[in-house]
Design a protein with these regions (language model features):
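Residue-level signal for secondary-structure boundary elements
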Residues: 25, 100, 189-190, 212, ...
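A conserved beta-strand-loop-helix scaffold within acyl/acetyltransferase catalytic domains
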Residues: 5-65, 111-113, 117-118, 127, ...
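Acyl-donor binding region in acyl/amide transferases
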Residues: 65-150, 300, 306-367
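C-terminal catalytic domain of photolyase/cryptochrome flavoproteins
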Residues: 15, 33, 41-42, 351-405
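Generic secondary-structure boundary/loop-capping signal
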Residues: 73, 157, 167, 376-378
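A general structural signal for short secondary-structure boundary/capping elements
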Residues: 102-104, 203, 234-237, 348-350, ...
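Bacterial peptidoglycan biogenesis and beta-lactam-recognition machinery
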Residues: 209, 341, 371-373
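Extreme N-terminal starter segment of soluble prokaryotic enzymes
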Residues: 1-3
Length: 405
């Protein structure tokens, strides 16, 4: 016999979620601390003494004392158990109604398809079956959009799995650029505290300025690191400006000497030397300016990663575009993913992408041979049926407005 509980112990919830095939950071009890602008509860279903369903519920206050609720990558349960699914949604609807909820939004961690770039996309048959189970439980599927703005969480994620990771799994482009990075005077550091937070925050600001977007601030990154403790880490890569400068300057002076000693009739050789000299002159000037600006070393890129259960999420990544020719991101991301797997993770989520699978972000991430995890999408569970249509319209208008800001 099932029993709905509205105050599940956070520790028991996490133990349950971490063992599930649907384990996801957004369902961790600590995620509520990160989303401090929402209130929250953890609800679930017991069968006897056994927890069989659980979900973090984020609660947003609306005008006139109404609320909306969101189950990020939840609920966690066996979606093949139709009786359990129907009981859960019937019970949570009744519970939410007492809290003046208009509707509940959810985006369960069900994979609609899994494939590599270039492979044929085949829909998982069990996902179709689970979709029918959910619809039978009176939740409304919101379709299969490809863009970012239509859903709270991206439907498409690029994920590297432990059994498909290594230098031999990189694409030709990835292997080449990693090799270039390894030859530069780059030093990658991993920190499970705020030691590298200032440098990480700086490269995130560089990314914001370059793309003309607003991401998060230093306080938010600190909140993530503090909240998840030893399960959150920064990967930062530094360029040794002094070593790089001395190496380039040595090549520059040698090139100058070679030009002086080059016979006048060796026109092709002289042309190549002068081209090299022009390039080295620019590089020397650039490095001189950067040494004045940054000192002996500079952080060129970084990532922020959180581990939960056997999964890991690279939540944020930034780079200083002035140093893109050193290929630091290839080394940084490789070391980040490597650290996740050394910590016992089976997957490393590099983040969401547009469903068109086009653009620079997809091109970069594709070099690590990721699997495309396409999630089943969002569902709505109407709670106040009379006001649901109006609230749904208002929600979509707000999403559209935010999209065009």
């Amino acid at each position: 016999m099932y029993k709905f509980i509205d105050k599940i112990d956070p520790k028991k919830h996490d133990e349950f979620v971490e063992k599930s095939v649907y384990c996801n950071l957004l369902q961790s009890s600590s995620w509520a601390k990160v989303k401090s602008n929402w209130s929250h509860e953890i609800v679930g279903v017991y069968e006897g003494e056994t927890l069989v369903a659980s979900s973090l519920v984020l609660i947003k206050k609306l005008p006139l004392s109404f609320t909306m609720m969101y189950l990020p990558r939840g609920p966690i349960m066996d979606y093949d158990n139709q009786e359990l699914v129907q009981f859960f949604f019937k019970a949570i609807r009744k519970w939410a109604k007492k809290r003046h909820c208009l509707f509940i939004k959810l985006d369960p961690g069900i994979h609609y398809s899994d494939y590599h770039l270039g492979d044929q996309r085949i829909v998982n048959e069990d996902a179709i079956r689970k979709l029918k189970v959910l619809e039978n439980a009176k939740v409304k599927h919101q379709g299969f959009p490809l863009d970012f703005s239509s859903t709270i969480q991206p439907r498409f994620h690029m994920v590297v799995y432990a059994n498909e990771f290594g230098e031999d799994c990189l694409t030709k482009k990835g292997a080449k650029n990693l090799k270039i990075a390894l030859k530069k005077h780059l030093d990658t550091k991993i920190g499970y505290n705020t030691t590298y937070l200032d440098d990480f925050s700086r490269v995130m600001n560089c990314t914001e300025n370059r793309k003309g977007i607003s991401l998060r601030n230093k306080d938010y990154y600190k909140l993530l690191l503090d909240t998840y403790g030893q399960n959150a880490f920064l990967t930062v890569t530094y360029l040794d400006l002094d070593q790089t400068y001395h190496e380039i300057y040595e090549r520059y002076t040698k090139c100058q000497k070679d030009i002086e000693e080059c016979p006048e009739n060796a026109t092709k050789k002289l042309f190549k030397l002068e081209e090299t000299n022009a390039s080295l002159t620019r590089e020397v000037k650039f490095l001189e300016e950067q040494r004045i600006k940054h000192g002996s070393k500079v952080c060129v890129c970084g990532t922020l990663t959180v581990i939960y259960g056997k999964t890991s999420e690279i939540l944020y990544a930034g780079m200083d575009n002035d140093f893109k020719r050193y290929m630091g991101p290839y080394l940084t991301w490789y070391k980040t993913i490597e650290e996740c797997f050394e910590r016992g993770c089976v997957s490393s989520n590099m983040g969401g992408v547009e469903g068109t699978l086009k653009g620079g972000l997809v091109d970069f991430k594709s070099v690590f041979h990721p699997t495309i995890n396409e999630f089943i999408g969002e569902f709505d569970l109407p709670v106040n049926k009379m006001l649901y249509s109006l609230s749904e319209m208002a929600y979509k208008l707000r999403k559209h407005k935010n999209k065009h800001k």
